[in-house]
Amino acid sequence: MASKDFHIVAETGIHARPATLLVQTASKFASDITLDYKGKAVNLKSIMGVMSLGVGQGADVTITAEGADADDAIAAINETMTKEGLA
């Protein structure tokens, strides 16, 4: 299991475009990957789940991956978050 905390700095938070990129990144891995925000956990491979959280600027989220490729998944998600200016 691997996890990482992120502080969302993007003005628009995790809106449709970056949410889609995060879901696409997570979907490349076999691990179960969740996004935790305000006590709610959703499957990071589900665009509807991610969008339903309404993660805005200044939010603190935790992404957790469980499975054989968990470390690689967290590294790829971290890269996407940084590249897109989300965290």
Curated annotation (Swiss-Prot):
It is found in: Cytoplasm. Phosphorylation on Ser-46 inhibits the phosphoryl transfer from enzyme I to HPr. The keyword Electron transport does not apply. InterPro entries: HPr, HPr-like, HPr-like_sf, PTS_HPr_His_P_site, PTS_HPr_Ser_P_site. The active site is at H15. GO terms for biological process: phosphoenolpyruvate-dependent sugar phosphotransferase system. It comes from the Bacteria. Pfam families: PTS-HPr. The modification Phosphoserine is found at S46. Belongs to the HPr family. General (non sugar-specific) component of the phosphoenolpyruvate-dependent sugar phosphotransferase system (sugar PTS). This major carbohydrate active-transport system catalyzes the phosphorylation of incoming sugar substrates concomitantly with their translocation across the cell membrane. The phosphoryl group from phosphoenolpyruvate (PEP) is transferred to the phosphoryl carrier protein HPr by enzyme I. Phospho-HPr then transfers it to the PTS EIIA domain. PANTHER family: PHOSPHOCARRIER PROTEIN HPR (PTHR33705), PHOSPHOCARRIER PROTEIN NPR (PTHR33705:SF2). This is Phosphocarrier protein HPr. The gene is ptsH.
